[in-house]
């Protein structure tokens, strides 16, 4: 489901999206760590020079923010550059059926991108624009927090079951979300511990995975577009059609095991 993040990948995606959309396309570019910024910016330059329009995420953020932005700005796709050197590729807008808008590209679609990459030649010869791309505003982060809080509040009509939690999450977004939901965050003596991978897609808790899935049973989507596996949960498919550990962790803290 991933590909090596490289300038050639951006060129291949540009070719793929141009063919899918029949013209100028919009691509969001997100990245996991500050060290990935230069590659993301180079990707934006390649996209602009290849007939597309690039929108860079405002800073290093978890992947669910990039997936969320695809739907919010009706982009035709997104690339998320991971710290591992791999890239997640999302499709949306005119490039995919509406039921899969904002979901990860299927293997068949990635194969077409691979073929486009193979036809691009060498990296040094790729055209690059000197500008033209935009930045996604910080307001997108607030919109994501608002949407998650609204979704979680809708899951528990009789009032939340709050528990003190401890949090390990690099971006700080989970703490912001928990504070919005009035969930106490503590350093010691927590009833529940929540740990999220830097890319924001995998949740590890002090509970076994089976108990997490039971607690989130009414929240989890059954959409075939969403990846499954230990630690991968999607609780808001209307906006993030991918594993979203941030939203899932906050939902677990509110819903508990009741």
Q: Which residues make up each language-model segment?
A:
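Gly/Ser/Thr-enriched, mixed-charge loops and adjacent short helices
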Residues: 2-4, 91-190
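Glycine-rich phosphate/diphosphate-binding loops that line cofactor/substrate pockets in enzymes
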Residues: 9-27, 151-160
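Active-site phosphate-binding/coordination module
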Residues: 65-124, 195-214, 230
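Phosphate-binding and adjacent anionic-ligand microenvironments
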Residues: 191-192, 196-258
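Ferredoxin-reductase
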Residues: 21-98, 189-193
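Buried hydrophobic positions in well-ordered alpha/beta secondary-structure cores of metabolic enzymes
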Residues: 29, 66, 79, 148, ...
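Short, highly selective alpha-helical patches that border small-molecule cofactor pockets
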Residues: 10, 36, 40, 44, ...
């Amino acid at each position: 489901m991933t590909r090596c993040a490289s300038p050639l990948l951006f060129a291949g995606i540009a070719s793929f999206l141009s063919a899918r959309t029949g013209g100028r396309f919009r691509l969001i570019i997100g990245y996991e760590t500050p060290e990935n910024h230069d590659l993301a910016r180079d990707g934006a330059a390649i996209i602009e020079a290849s007939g597309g329009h690039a929108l860079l995420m405002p800073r290093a953020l978890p992947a669910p923010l990039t997936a969320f932005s695809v739907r919010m700005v009706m982009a035709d796709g997104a690339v998320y550059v991971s710290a591992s050197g791999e890239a997640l590729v999302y499709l949306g807008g005119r490039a995919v059926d509406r039921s899969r808008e904002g979901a990860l590209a299927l293997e068949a679609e990635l194969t077409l991108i691979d073929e486009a990459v193979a036809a691009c030649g060498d990296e040094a010869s790729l055209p690059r624009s000197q500008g033209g791309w935009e930045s996604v505003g910080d307001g997108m982060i607030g919109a994501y927090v608002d949407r998650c809080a609204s979704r979680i509040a809708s899951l528990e009509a009789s009032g939340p079951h709050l528990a003190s939690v401890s949090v390990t999450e690099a971006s700080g977004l989970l703490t912001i979300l928990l504070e919005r939901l009035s969930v106490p965050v503590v350093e010691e003596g927590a009833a529940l511990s929540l740990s999220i991978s830097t890319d924001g897609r995998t949740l590890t808790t002090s509970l076994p995975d089976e108990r997490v899935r039971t607690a989130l049973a009414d929240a989890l989507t059954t959409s075939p577009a969403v990846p499954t596996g230990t630690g991968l949960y999607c609780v808001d498919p209307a906006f993030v059609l991918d594993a979203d550990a941030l939203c899932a962790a906050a939902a677990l803290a509110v819903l508990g095991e009741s």
